[in-house]
Amino acid sequence: MIKVNLDHTDININKVADLNKIKEIHQMIFNKTGKGNDFLGWLNWPVNFNKTEYEQMKLVANDLKNQIEVLVVIGIGGSYLGCRAADEMIRGLYHQNKVELIYTGNTMSSTYIYQVVEYLKNKNFGICVISKSGTTTEPGISFRVFEKLLVDKVGLEKAKSLIVAITDKNKGALKQLAEKKGYQTFVIPNDIGGRFSVLTPVGIFPLLVSGINTDKIFQGALKAKNDLINDDLSNQAYKYAVVRNYLYNQGYKTEALISYELQLQMLTEWWKQLFGESEGKENKGLLPSSMIFSTDLHSLGQWVQEGPRNVMFETIIKIEKPNHDLNVPIDEDNYDGLNYLTKKSFHQINQTALKGVIQAHSVTGKMPNIVLEFEKMDDEQFGYLVYFFELALAMSAYLLDVNPFNQPGVEVYKYNMFKLLNKPGIK
């Protein structure tokens, strides 16, 4: 369901790949002997996910979505990006007659929080708060606001049926709070890190409330697990990992993930965290960036075409089948001179633009273009791409010889912030 096309890179992957190294890392991943191997729970999750908990989530989600118009999803980083990526990719940006998902806890902007509070005052809403520890600043202070808003509106007893916590199985501030107040809880597995957690209750529960077919998401992830089992370049995830690693070793500093579909913007944000937080350490790693074409061609297209070379390469997501399509209507006066497009659909025009841009950037601009060919934008495809990117990331990070599953650098800003806020115990 994902094919890696290297026709626009001038790279002979069979010549640049170290097949013995790929086999070695493949064994390291699946035998769980590499750095950070305690966090490889995602590897077999499409098979080993907790079926009993999943059925319980379905029951709770069905009950909740019959009571609310809006679900406030409170989390930051991996606690919300994957869910939002799935929601927008599958349902689109302007879905109707379904529970709306609104995301908070991902910012400390007072203006944004105030706007969400005002929006919810006349809405029936529930809360899904997601935090392993329950002490992360952004979701913690956000949950205080929206829990109070909900309890003040419906009372504590009613709120118990409208608040769900996704957290640690046994410990942590959020787990203790949920048990004390009687909120339903589901578990964040100990062996799956936040940026890998979208197929756990972290992402699956809010998506169930939104009405997305999560059974198909799991089917897609399982298909990817079965497809991506080989220890050579026939494995498309490894092919992608190897070519991006080769370009990094050639001196490229940035990879731009390009989509021609606006509803994939949050997918690119999820991808940026997955690769940036996993590889950006020990003074190594590509800077993951993203653009939406053709929109960003009108702002960054000039730089991409004629800016510095050997700095950035592009990875393009190409969608074979759009969720919907429509034709350009004819205008009798042809005032804009665009009647020549009336026999073409918007998707045909979009795909033609993609081809033209790839030619401009890769041939004229001498910028390598990797093309990831996706079949569609649905539930099954989402599950597939999650597993594809996570496995590709594991291979890519081990090729860099870094631990894909830790993030020690993020503690620096947290310490400085806590010190400035006079947090107890911080000196």
Swiss-Prot record:
Q: What are the recorded Gene Ontology BP terms?
A: gluconeogenesis; glucose 6-phosphate metabolic process; glycolytic process
Q: What is its main location?
A: cytoplasm
The record's listing under PROSITE patterns reads: P_GLUCOSE_ISOMERASE_1 (PS00765), P_GLUCOSE_ISOMERASE_2 (PS00174), P_GLUCOSE_ISOMERASE_3 (PS51463)
> Which residues does the entry assign to the active site, renumbered to this chain?
E277 (proton donor), H298, K414
- Cellular localisation: Cytoplasm
- Give the family this protein belongs to, as stated in its UniProt record: Belongs to the GPI family.
Q: What is this protein called?
A: Glucose-6-phosphate isomerase
Q: Which organism does this sequence originate in?
A: Mycoplasma capricolum subsp. capricolum (strain California kid / ATCC 27343 / NCTC 10154)
Q: Which gene underlies this protein?
A: pgi
